[in-house]
């Protein structure tokens, strides 16, 4: 978190000499009367008192300024007792590292391993304890491609692995409404595409929102990361329902697909 530091500009009041000598080459100084001595003595005492007060105020200001500069204030401290993790690295308590055959992956710490096999070549599946709609899977299949770009653009690649998004189960006649084409009860929209290169290896990343006519969960956010290495196609897919996506599941889905690395 960015720390707020306070800086105090200290200014020392300028002091001017209160006494000036008046002399004359032709006259001697006039004798000082007793009442004049008393007045001058009082002025000197007042000046000393003021100087002491100023010194104390300056000392206090210096101490406060030093404390402010030396203390880093975190906005989340008062409310939560710890710094907020905005735009920071993932906390170790939120993700655990999984090492599989030829790949490494960050898995949400609160998700459990699942034995359900949903896709060809699936070697791993984890799902949310409370909602199995939120899950991730890793698939490793043989390929004759040398690089992920050999599949064409990311959109072309997605069309070749569209089984990852689920198949339409109903093929009856339907009207064109609710954003669905005629006779279609499912739709998929690509929200984001990226082609990052990590350690000299190119990846495809796609964010897809799928919806079905039954309105289940308001749709599903499905994130796919894929690359090719040593004659194998590696795909990591993670998803969450639209409602849970905006209630905290997003960081787990994005974290899983963003931090997969293939040897």
UniProtKB/Swiss-Prot annotation:
Q: What is this protein called?
A: Oxygen-evolving enhancer protein 2, chloroplastic
Q: Briefly describe its induction.
A: Down-regulated in response to mixed metal ion contamination (cadmium, copper, lead and zinc), but not in response to zinc ion contamination.
Q: Where is this region: Disordered?
A: 14-34
Q: Which keywords does this Swiss-Prot/TrEMBL entry list? A: Chloroplast, Membrane, Photosynthesis, Photosystem II, Plastid, Thylakoid, Transit peptide
Q: Where is the transit peptide?
A: 1-78
Q: Which SUPFAM superfamilies match?
A: Mog1p/PsbP-like
Gene assigned in the entry: PSBP
The record's Gene Ontology cellular component field reads: chloroplast thylakoid membrane; extrinsic component of membrane; photosystem II oxygen evolving complex
One Pfam family cited in the UniProt record for this chain:
PsbP
GO MF terms here are:
calcium ion binding
Species of origin: Helianthus annuus (Common sunflower)
Q: Where in the cell is it found?
A: Plastid, Chloroplast thylakoid membrane
- The answer to whether UniProt assigns keyword Thylakoid to this entry is yes
So what does this one do? May be involved in the regulation of photosystem II.
Q: Where is the composition biased (Low complexity)?
A: 14-30
Major site of localization recorded for this protein: plastid
Q: Which family does it belong to?
A: Belongs to the PsbP family.
